[in-house]
Amino acid sequence: MDPKKFSPKLLFQIIVQLISGANKEGYNHALVKVFGSRLKDMPLKSSLCKIRQRISFKFFEDTFLDLLKDFEPQRRTFKSLCIYSIDGLQMTLPRTNNIVDAGYTGRAVSKYRESYMPRMYLTHAYDVLSGVTKAFKYHTRPDEITDAVNMVAMFEKNSVCLYDRLYICARLIRAHIKTGNYFLFRARAKGVKKEVQEFFNSKRRRSSYVFEGLTIYLIKIKNQKTKKDDVFSTNLPPDWVTKKTIRRLYTLRWGVETSFCELTSTAKIQQWHSKFLNGILQELYAMFWVINYTKIQMYLRQESTTNPLNSKYSKPNFKLIFNWVKDRMGKILNKTRRVLDGMKWLIKISKEKREHLSRSYRREIKGPASPYPYNNTVWNII
């Protein structure tokens, strides 16, 4: 095939088919799915690999952002607030000269040693109500606070972001003050402002303090599983700061953890098909596009009458529907009419009733990242 006739749009279709393929289905399967009866126009695998290097991942990024932009008017809110959650993920990359030269190295396992395979550190902003990725950042080193600060600036004023204990810091609070939106941190006892530390050690159940003109509320809520108090810090309006509302609102943060399972286990994102950073990023943006596309189509076919803070809810089987969409990706990219007609039926038959916090398991750590002891942990080191 003449490289001059090979457009970024055509490459996007091939990469989507490539990452959507079953196990051991590589370039040739993806090319056959895209070209179909036009096999004489199909490039060789070696030619495609060379063409991939000429097309920047920025085209894939723009396609991902265009999908989000089109979906924006239809997003779900709760009491006029968008609800986000931010967390980080560590991904393994192939070890090649191109990736190492880009600054990606292994994870430190001691003072003088690091793992052989390079790591990419991903920070993910997730819309917990719509189930869609709002934004993500990637780096050669873990820097989730900086990523969160940059992403908060992209959020709407009528939004709240949920964080775990890592994120509570003055820098991130200032970012929310500047943007004018809300936050909800699960607080930690050390490495935080003096007012938060004193509240941890006191017998008070509620408190507040002023930080650079902003009133921040502190509340203790007993964890029914661990029988210990969790402390939360927020700038939400006072009528929101109740035990029931804060606990159920923070429970929604688990959606971002589930999204990482979908990315690594369901979508198998770490099964890369390139040895170059540009190719890795092409696949990363393409996979987020496929996941977002599936989530959006599911969202548009479901009623949104339930309160998201209810402890009981129903949810369809994402893995089933994701694989069903992957099998039809060629027709979807070619804009075949009525190709998704069966999705509503799949949502109906796979939907299950669930309940937040109905089950809990102690963490298992097989490869500790720190020499310090972990609380509430089962050690299972082989």
Annotate each PLM feature:
Residues 23-38:
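Extended, structured, electrostatic nucleic-acid-contact surfaces
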Residues 34-50:
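Short, basic interhelical loop/turn and adjoining N-cap
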Residues 58-74:
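Short Lys/Arg-enriched helix C-cap and helix-to-coil transition segments
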